[in-house]
């Protein structure tokens, strides 16, 4: 009986709200700023979009023409519209802070360096493989190289122990994103198609999304006081949806069908887009999260 009373007393003491411990727990919980639910929903929905795209390419799309053989083409556009609208809404509704990107971050740096490598591979492949459009090939090659240099500068900034601005002005940003301007123009000049072929149409959306994201990102890193944080977050989620979740299934389908060598420059460029998509998702999460509250909790307990 006495032993039971002692156990009950110990349990009661453990549950008492001691000031130091309770304040620490409150500080820790408050310091943990979980990912915005809308942003998390957008990321998950984009992944579902990618899985659906993989199934669509494997079963419901003609491999030769790119035309839909089962279901309406407008169902594909509707799914894309939902993913894009949710990404934009999540980014605009959140309270991101672009300044949080001005600090070392190894995942961001790795993705930027990988993207730079694939863009450099696009440059080499464009010059090595001969095609009929000599002028367009050369322009695309050197613009890809410029984009590679810009992404490499971003990667070095994020992977260095002490943060350094990748550029003090926006000249490098303009040169680094010019390839996406060119891709939009080339899509209409060289390979225009009807709305019934989803992939060529969505390429334009991908280029515009990457252009907006990298432009706003470059401004946020070079001129933090003039950054548009909400546009940065929204465009980051959009490139996650379009440049990663939509593009990767198409690259995987090309790889499985054995068409990589015939489209090697486009394949490398697509891999670069995927890296930009991952980078967009990382940046969107970083701008909306705060550091863990463990340090503040430790100080309050002490």
Q: Which residue ranges define each predicted feature?
A:
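Short, positively charged and aromatic/hydrophobic N-terminal segments
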Residues: 2-12, 17, 21-28
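Membrane-interface helix-boundary motifs at transmembrane edges
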Residues: 96-106, 157-170, 221-230
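C-terminal transmembrane-bundle signature of multipass membrane proteins
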Residues: 39-57, 85-88, 203-302
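N-terminal topogenic module of multi-pass integral membrane proteins
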Residues: 28-137
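Alpha-helical transmembrane segments of multi-pass integral membrane proteins
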Residues: 42-52, 108-125, 140-153, 169-187, ...
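Juxtamembrane "helix-exit" motif on the non-cytosolic side of transmembrane helices
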Residues: 54-63, 123-132, 184-195, 247-258
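Alpha-helical transmembrane segments of polytopic membrane proteins
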Residues: 68-84, 108-112, 122-126, 134-150, ...
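Canonical alpha-helical transmembrane segments
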Residues: 83-99, 149-159, 211-220
């Amino acid at each position: 009986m006495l032993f039971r009373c002692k156990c009950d007393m110990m349990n009661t003491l453990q549950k008492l709200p001691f000031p130091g411990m309770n304040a620490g727990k409150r500080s820790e919980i408050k310091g943990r700023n979980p990912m915005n639910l809308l942003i998390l929903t957008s990321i998950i929905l984009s992944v579902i979009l990618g899985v659906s795209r993989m199934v669509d390419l494997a079963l419901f799309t003609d491999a030769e023409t790119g035309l839909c053989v089962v279901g309406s083409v407008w169902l594909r556009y509707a799914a894309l519209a939902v993913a894009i609208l949710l990404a934009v809404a999540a980014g605009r509704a959140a309270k991101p802070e672009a300044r949080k990107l001005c600090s070392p971050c190894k995942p961001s740096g790795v993705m930027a360096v990988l993207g730079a490598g694939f863009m450099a591979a696009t440059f080499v492949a464009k010059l090595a493989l001969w095609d009929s459009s000599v002028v367009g090939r050369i322009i695309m090659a050197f613009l890809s190289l410029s984009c590679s240099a810009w992404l490499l500068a971003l990667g070095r900034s994020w992977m260095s122990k002490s943060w350094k601005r990748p550029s003090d002005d926006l000249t490098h940003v303009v040169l680094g994103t010019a390839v996406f301007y060119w891709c939009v123009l080339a899509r209409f000049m060289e390979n225009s198609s009807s709305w019934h072929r989803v992939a060529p149409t969505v390429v334009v959306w991908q280029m515009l999304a990457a252009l907006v994201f990298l432009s706003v990102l470059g401004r946020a890193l070079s001129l933090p006081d003039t950054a548009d944080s909400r546009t940065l977050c929204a465009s980051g989620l959009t490139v996650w949806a379009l440049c990663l979740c939509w593009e990767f299934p198409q690259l995987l389908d090309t790889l499985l069908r054995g068409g990589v060598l015939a489209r090697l420059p486009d394949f490398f460029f697509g891999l670069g887009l995927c890296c930009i998509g991952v980078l967009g998702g990382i940046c969107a999460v970083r701008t909306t999260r705060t550091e863990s509250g463990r340090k503040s909790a430790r100080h309050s307990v002490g």
